[in-house]
Amino acid sequence: MKFLREVAPMQQYLVKTKMDRSLLVSADDAESIVCTINKDLEVTKGTFRQLGLNMSLGKSVMDTVSFLFQMRDDRIHTSYESVNSNRHGYQPWKRSKFLPVSFWDLVIVGTDAINLIARFFSEPEWKTTSYRFIYFHVYSYNPAAVDRWAIARIDFDLHTVEYFDGRVDGRPNLKPPELTNFLDALKTVLRPILVSLCPEYMEEWVCSAYTETYFELLDNNYDSGVYTTAITYFLCQTMPLYFDRISIQRLRMSLAYWILVGELPI
């Protein structure tokens, strides 16, 4: 994986230069634009500065991460279609949808499922025939955690909802009761959306915490957003989740660089 390697010196120089210039001197200064991604998403000094050492990532950074992952999936889809669409036995690329943080905020306050789907999907996309996964950030099951990012993934082929958390041990016998309660609540609040998106499937959706993990557990109050980004990258590559704390430190630097250049590597 690319983020397991140390960022190249010139890339480090670019990030550190921008980071130094992003030190905030006033509330107004926080709204100054550091870069614009895809001519659409503006990244402010206040957002970019969160990628500094030992700082917790806020909603603006996590929304930027989701935006970059969606761009990456769109690029893969376009390349796949251009190469394979005329081949015999062609199978369409099963796409992923990466939703912004506001999706989960709206889910937990009970927003009507149909209106919520309409907000995040254009009408032709309501039926998920072309989608395999939907990813969205959630808050960790652990209410005592200050830095609480985790990620959930809806799988429309297997009809499952999986939860990925840097604080969850890979050994299923060590799951705390709070996690079980959280998974029950997750399934309950998502059920109307799942039925709306996939009405032909009326059986039970399985909601579980992913346990095939081979990484060092999160043990601080500022890296959960970076952990979540690492987990998402491995999931997109369909690889076992393996990384250590050094990899997380490198990923924080890499993520800052990718935001500046406006794309994630394939």
Explain the meaning of each model-derived region.
Residues 52, 80, 84-266:
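Cysteine protease-like catalytic core of ubiquitin/ubiquitin-like
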Residues 2-81, 211-266:
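Active-site nucleophile-adjacent alpha helix/oxyanion-hole segment immediately C-terminal to the catalytic cysteine
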